[in-house]
Every structure is written in C-alpha cells, then in structure tokens.
C-alpha cells in the first residue's frame, strides 16, 4: 500500500477542486477497465464541496456503471437536511444520471429502530457484496472517521456495518461502515481541512491510536490536506 499526501492546498475550496479533478480522472480510468465502480461518499462541508465540484466533471462519463455508497449516515428522518444522502443528492446525484438502483442510501428512522435498520442494511450489503474502489472520508478533530469515534463501542451488525447509539456528536444515533468494510477498499482518500484538525492529522501521521489511523486502502491511501490542516506536520 502506498500513501500520497497533498498538503499545500490553500483552503477547503482549492482542496475540493483538486480532489474532485483527481476523482473524475480516477473514475474515468476505472470505468475503462471494469464493468462497474463502487464509490463510497462522505458528508461534511468539504466532502459535499467535492461532490459539487465533481458533478460537471463526470457528466460525460458512463455514470450508469457507478454504484454509490456512504461511509456513514445520521439516523434521522429520510428527508432531513442532516442526512449525508440528502446533501449528496443536492450536490451531485440530482445532476448526473446515476440510476436510482445504483444509489445505496443507508436507512432512516422510517425503516425501524436503529438496530433493525442497521441489520436490514447489513443484509443488503451481504447479498451484494460490494468491492469498494474508492472510499472518501473526512476526519474529525478527535480523529474519528465515518461514525467510528475514539473510545466508542458501537453495536456490530454483521462484519461490514455498525450502529452507534450514543455518538459524541449530534445526532446520537448513526449507522456506519465498519473498519473491516472501510479497509476492504482499494483506495481510501481523506479530505481534511482546517486548523482545528491539525493536531489530529499530526497524531495520525505519528501512528497514534485514533480511528483514522486504523483505516487505509489496500492499494493507495491519499490525503488531501489544506495548509491549515497540515500545519502541525513536522515532515
């Protein structure tokens, strides 16, 4: 596994443009050599900026062969603006012709209680099962990725899904891909912006025990850092 670090980006806007351009190129390459491509999206301010930038760049690709997944989801009402799916729909999915059948949104509160909904989604993944080509991830100031938080003990629902009933960030209830699922990916791309993330970035690069340290791509791990997020790196 190799690691690439882009660490001199001026801010979140430049980060989003750079990552989106690279992702469009990678999707084009993958579509040329595979029958389908499995892409895992992330939420957050920077993650959604990337999707907005990506939309016009992939409009001419054969997007009908792209399968869309999410790293995690807030367990709220289906059309809540807090949902990563709803934000991604506005930024990307409403602008490109990816078939509805290819969009694998995580459950909402309309799908039962947290455990039941997570179990149903786990069964869907088990029946598929996807081979993730590229996973996009943000990272919190505490080093969390998806809804995998430091010191938390989420409910394990099968091998690929966990349910978090008491997230330290609101809303408390969340569904997330597990470490096993994230680490199954060929490529993992971290999108991290802001001075408030700098200490966690440095800790991850020093190999400290944080969720982000535990995730890497089998082929490639790529970090997109703006200057603020990279400000505490020493080398």
PLM segments and residue spans:
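N-terminal glycine-/serine-/threonine-rich phosphate-binding loop
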Residues: 1-39, 115
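Ligand-binding beta-strand-loop-alpha-helix segment within the catalytic cores
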Residues: 2-3, 64-134
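Glycine-rich N-terminal segment of FAD-binding domains in flavoprotein oxidoreductases
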Residues: 28-57
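Glycine-rich beta-strand-to-loop/alpha-helix junction loops that act as flexible
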Residues: 41-46, 137-141, 193
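A glycine- and small-aliphatic-rich helix-loop capping segment at beta-alpha/alpha-beta transitions
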Residues: 53-62, 86, 90, 150-159
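A short secondary-structure junction signal
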Residues: 116, 146-151, 200-204, 235
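Class I SAM-dependent methyltransferase SAM-binding "motif I" and its flanking Rossmann-like core
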Residues: 134-137, 141-180
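C-terminal functional extensions of proteins
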Residues: 182-235
């Amino acid at each position: 596994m190799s690691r690439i670090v882009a660490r001199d980006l001026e801010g979140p806007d430049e980060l989003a443009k750079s990552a989106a351009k690279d992702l469009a190129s990678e999707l084009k390459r993958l579509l040329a050599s595979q029958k389908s491509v499995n892409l895992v999206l992330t939420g957050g301010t920077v993650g959604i900026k990337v999707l907005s930038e990506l939309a016009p760049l992939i409009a001419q690709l054969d997007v009908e062969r792209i399968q869309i997944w999410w790293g995690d989801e807030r367990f709220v009402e289906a059309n809540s603006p807090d949902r990563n799916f709803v934000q991604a729909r506005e930024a990307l999915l409403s602008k490109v012709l990816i078939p509805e059948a290819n969009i694998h949104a995580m459950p909402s509160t309309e799908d039962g209680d947290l455990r039941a909904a997570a179990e149903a989604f786990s069964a869907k993944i088990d029946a598929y099962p996807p081979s993730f080509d590229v996973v996009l991830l943000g990272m919190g100031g505490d080093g969390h990725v998806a809804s995998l938080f430091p010191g938390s003990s989420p409910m394990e629902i099968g091998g690929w899904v966990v349910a978090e009933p008491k997230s330290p960030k609101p809303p408390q209830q969340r569904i997330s891909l597990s470490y096993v699922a994230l680490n199954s990916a060929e490529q993992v791309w971290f999108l991290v912006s802001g001075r408030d993330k700098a200490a966690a970035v440095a800790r991850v690069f020093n190999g400290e025990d944080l969720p982000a340290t535990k995730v890497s791509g089998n082929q490639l791990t790529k970090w997109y850092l703006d200057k603020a997020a990279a400000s505490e790196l020493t080398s």
